[in-house]
């Protein structure tokens, strides 16, 4: 069975969650899904775990305009992940995110004006098929 969405967002890092927020708030009625390969949100701030990892840009400009950063200008990965998590929680974005879904193909059909995306589920190895009018990467 294929699930159909207006927009498919690739990744639940800071950019993907920002995209999800804007779709949720500014485009009511638009169906969207975020596919994340990892077991949780955070992108780089989840996967890079070396000692002392932190932003190299200040979070006052790197953060979301809709949720101004209130912490220290240069933040740790844990602080950034917490910030992203607050956005997910406060805006009920969780139901739109599927963790453990690694995209293995994305094909555009000019005839149908539609993306067909296939992802592999980490928990079962099953292939999931999603179609979308717009692919946000």
Regions found by a protein language model. Name each.
Residues 2-5, 131-133:
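Active-site acidic short loop of glycosyltransferases
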Residues 3-34:
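N-terminal Rossmann-like FAD-binding beta1-loop-alpha1 element of flavoenzymes
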Residues 16, 41, 106:
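Flexible, glycine-rich phosphate/dinucleotide-binding loops
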Residues 25-29, 38, 91-93:
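Short, solvent-exposed loop/edge-beta patches enriched in aromatic
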Residues 34-43, 131-137:
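Carboxylate/His-rich catalytic cores and anion/metal-binding grooves
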Residues 37-86:
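Glycine-rich active-site loop/strand segments that organize a redox cofactor
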Residues 71-137:
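Feature captures the FAD/FMN-dependent oxidoreductase FAD-binding
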């Amino acid at each position: 069975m294929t699930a159909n969405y207006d927009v498919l967002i690739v990744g639940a890092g800071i950019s993907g969650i920002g995209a999800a927020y804007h779709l949720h708030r500014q485009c009511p009625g638009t169906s969207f899904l975020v596919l994340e390969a990892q077991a949780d949100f955070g992108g780089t701030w989840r996967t890079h775990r070396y000692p002392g990892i932190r932003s190299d840009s200040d979070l006052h400009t790197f953060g979301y305009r809709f949720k101004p950063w209130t912490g220290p200008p240069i933040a740790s990965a844990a602080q950034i992940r917490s910030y992203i998590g607050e956005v997910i929680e406060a805006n009920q974005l969780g139901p739109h995110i599927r963790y453990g879904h690694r995209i293995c193909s994305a094909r555009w059909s000019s005839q149908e004006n539609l993306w067909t995306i296939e992802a592999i589920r980490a928990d079962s190895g099953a292939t999931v098929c999603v179609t979308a009018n717009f692919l946000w990467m």
